[in-house]
Regions:
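Redox-cofactor binding/interface segments in oxidoreductases and associated redox assembly factors
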Residues: 39
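N-terminal beta1-alpha1 ligand-phosphate binding loop
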Residues: 1-17
């Protein structure tokens, strides 16, 4: 839905640093030129994209030598009891699957944009929302991102 990119753009805007590159992870060929690396990844049908894991595994040694951070964007984080790195099931599972330990970790609630989804996606997400007591009106868009939390995360990054 583009919410991860929107969060990246907000981080860039809040940092007041004109030397920030926002790139899709599969377009990053080399991280040598960067002092800091922040990886943002969203959940789609219960999983992060495989490119996220491939990128981290390929660059783990370099990532460990740099200031680094990871943030997750998922709709489960709309719930107060699942909106921290310690309580979000996707972040917990992610950290169990990789050898990298990010120096800073954030988790942000994403967005559901029912009108933009194709038929199957719309009703699959509606069903998931129904069983988790989320919004099910398919004529609307629901943004759950706590922008104040994004701002606090950005301050912690010292970009």
């Amino acid at each position: 839905d583009g919410q991860t990119k929107e969060i990246c753009e907000k981080i860039s805007e809040l940092s007041n640093n004109s030397c920030i590159d926002i790139l899709p992870i599969n377009e990053v060929s080399n991280i040598d030129a960067y002092e800091k690396v922040v990886i943002g990844a969203s959940i789609r049908y219960g999983n992060y994209r495989k490119e996220v894991f491939q990128f981290i595994n390929k660059n783990i040694k370099k990532l460990e030598l740099k200031e680094n951070a990871f943030f997750s964007v998922n709709v489960v984080a709309r719930k107060k009891e699942k909106n921290s790195p310690e309580t979000n099931p996707y972040v917990i599972k992610f950290l169990d699957k990789i050898d990298w330990v990010p120096k800073k970790i954030g988790v942000f609630a994403g967005k559901i944009d029912y009108p933009s989804y194709k038929f199957f996606d719309k009703y699959a997400i509606k069903f998931i929302m129904w069983i988790t007591n989320g919004p099910t009106d398919t004529s609307k868009t629901f943004e759950f991102t706590d922008w104040k939390k994004v701002e606090e995360f950005t301050k912690d990054l010292n970009l």
